[in-house]
Amino acid sequence: MNISNSQVNRLRHFVRAGLRSLFRPEPQTAVEWADANYYLPKESAYQEGRWETLPFQRAIMNAMGSDYIREVNVVKSARVGYSKMLLGVYAYFIEHKQRNTLIWLPTDGDAENFMKTHVEPTIRDIPSLLALAPWYGKKHRDNTLTMKRFSNGRGFWCLGGKAAKNYREKSVDVAGYDELAAFDDDIEQEGSPTFLGDKRIEGSVWPKSIRGSTPKVRGTCQIERAASESPHFMRFHVACPHCGEEQYLKFGDKETPFGLKWTPDDPSSVFYLCEHNACVIRQQELDFTDARYICEKTGIWTRDGILWFSSSGEEIEPPDSVTFHIWTAYSPFSTWVQIVKDWMKTKGDTGKRKTFVNTTLGETWEAKIGERPDAEVMAERKEHYSAPVPDRVAYLTAGIDSQLDRYEMRVWGWGPGEESWLIDRQIIMGRHDDEQTLLRVDEAINKTYTRRNGAEMSISRICWDIGGIDPTIVYERSKKHGLFRVIPIKGASVYGKPVASMPRKRNKNGVYLTEIGTDTAKEQIYNRFTLTPEGDEPLPGAVHFPNNPDIFDLTEAQQLTAEEQVEKWVDGRKKILWDSKKRRNEALDCFVYALAALRISISRWQLDLSALLASLQEEDGAATNKKTLADYARALSGEDE
């Protein structure tokens, strides 16, 4: 029987096609695959180029990619590459292990941005992934902002974490959460995000849940809660280059005999003091090649996340659930000098101190519950203003609080570093929906204030609360005075939410209804109340009050300090909430709204308070130097001598 060459070639083609479905690549760990394939795109990386796993990332990534570890929690600071690790492991799951994957981010906007700036460029820059994406760069049902379906049949979803519907109808092998601490505690009264999300992997042969976040407030932080449910909490231990003793790096403080130490006011002098033998260690001396993660609860350890050992050194099965902690001191993307500089910037500012603890140390912040400023002490902090608008004020904003029988407005002046001065207090009595009352509010909005040189300043931006009244009243006033000048607002009591989140588009009522992070604003304001100016020296963040009983008195001070943080159980969860205890707090609310108006001006219109003040002072100087004929006559007659 003769077979032609063309028949042989056709047979070879069909045999290969039939066997192709049986082909499996040689197994690789997540780190092996990432080092061989992963590429950091220019859109979402400080430095574009091929991925190279760092020593402290090795065990974390391999644990994420392991089929034997069901839950991985990562409690971390900023600048350790968590999102990049997560995305690299997801690419590994899709291309190498052929798994269905899903990741949630705190909001729909976060998810959309992550898909555009991280996921899509990563698909483009990894050839093996791009080969599975014939739809790349095209409109296609398998290529949307929430889902990518690859030609190997595997799907990847990227969704916001606020809506309960985003936790339904998906059957995946891998569920991931980026910045878990920023998620709502209870998703539309249906449960915690990890409880809802992990339901999506219950039918998988190899279920995997990956959670990571910079932590927030102790006792209410979701990544802290997830970590506490894991039996293993791993910290990265490195040997001292001088005595050889292992330890994990600690920031330390004045009372701690080890950790980062430096000469006062000289960050460049920083070194690490070994906790075992007081050896002086410089950052460049540490070698992380053989460093290992050790559990502070059980003593088990691993170097690579593949092989695990008991505290006595015997090899054991990988744990079902594990938590890793890593912080900035280990990162080559930062320096110990910069850590010290950042720490020094937090002096006297509790808000900055909390940010440092969360984002640099990767630790939860322990809130001081029940403390509030002393109103009587604050009431004595009156100052003589040189004019209705003090010299260092560059910009005026106002906040309006709505009540059924009145409107209350406070005008605040702002200088460089957000130093602030209370400029005016207006209480407009009358029915909230009466036009005559609203006309008097109009007058207050359009009132001008005088600088020392006689120049008039108007209120540049006003945030007006819609709570408790018909919001269309505020909407119409916004249209009357200017959509960008009078901005309707509503409060959002969510920890960590920006002071102001102004939308890019108008709502269906034709206005820019803006959410205010009231908790964040109040915390910042209370921190600033602790700053005490010395004489007339500028002090960023300091708050000033006029020696004018029509504007500032004990009642105003009491309202500014009316609220305190309290612990409450809400739907079975402990939360830290701001509570006025039924004390009047209109002055504080107005301050919050005025601060929000300033932040909108900075974020949306790039307001630069320092540059604006310099410009105003030039105008003040020019006005001061202008002389009238009468001035010259007095000078010539000797009257000015």
What do these predicted regions represent?
Residues 2-400, 407, 439-460, 479-481:
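Phosphate/NTP-binding elements of NTP-utilizing enzymes
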Residues 95-96, 414-417:
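Short connector loops/turns at beta-strand edges and beta->alpha or beta->beta junctions
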Residues 114-118, 122, 265, 269-278, ...:
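Mg2+-dependent endonuclease catalytic cores in nucleic-acid-processing enzymes, primarily RNase H-like
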Residues 149, 412-414:
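A generic structural motif
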Residues 180-181, 403, 412, 467:
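Anionic group-transfer/hydrolysis microenvironments
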Residues 322, 326, 334-338, 358, ...:
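Extracellular low-complexity, Gly/Ser/Thr-rich intrinsically disordered linkers
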Residues 401, 462, 590:
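Hydrophobic, well-ordered secondary-structure elements that form the walls
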Residues 604-614:
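Mixed-charge, glycine-rich, non-catalytic linkers/tails in nucleic-acid processing enzymes
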